[in-house]
Amino acid sequence: MPSYLLSEADNAELLLDRLQVASGVEARSLDDGDMTRLVYLFVARILKEQPALNKSRVLAIHVGPGNTRLMLFKKGRIVQYNSYRMGAYRVADAVEKMGSGSDNLLSDIKAHVNGIIEQIVGAYANEPIDEVIAIGHEIQPVATTLAKDEEPLMKADRKTLSRLAKQLSVSKEKQLAETYEVNVYATRPLLAGVVCNLEVAGKFGLSALHVPTGRCGERLLTGLAGSDFAAKRFVHEV
């Protein structure tokens, strides 16, 4: 279940209690602070491993289920952070309630997020962006299908991703589940997540996005390994 749905549910505590009883494992919902720290540690590790990116002004975008987080890094250090209610599931749910058909789905998603995209552009208007790193459960499996090797970070052409987005908008759920190796429920936000990233990158005039390959959750957790130094720097900088 997407964390934003759990955090906003009236019976969240009851659901967590039942999950704990059924599994025998203590469970809690990740809050915004938890996710922000995870994303920061992950991006900090990417920049450390990519010297060229580490010298640039990099905007990291994490399109989560309910919110989109943006972090601006200059020479490897975070200098600005913003969060917006523009998550992949949130957008997909809102557009679904509009009754969009496949013919209008892509344009309806763009229209729905346009206002928030303009807010993002305004927030970073005084900061020239050299590169974008896009992180998320939707953009990563989609972009990974374009990867030519097993590098942990790929550079995805925006025009190519835009063509994939058009395919996503007309594809059946079963086909999407098989292609991107996700369950059927997780296919619903795929298009919204990809579009959010493309719209942000496009507004800043970037022709490509750097995308970590593989599954987002696994990469976030493995990114914690050896991250003690980054964690201390996170506290200091943020």
Where in this protein do the model-derived segments appear?
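Helical "lid/coupling" subdomains associated with nucleotide-phosphate turnover
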Residues: S3-K55, L72-K74, Q80-V238
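Short beta-strand segments
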Residues: A60-G64, A134-G136
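Acidic, divalent-metal-coordinating active-site segment for phosphoryl/phosphodiester hydrolysis
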Residues: G66-R69
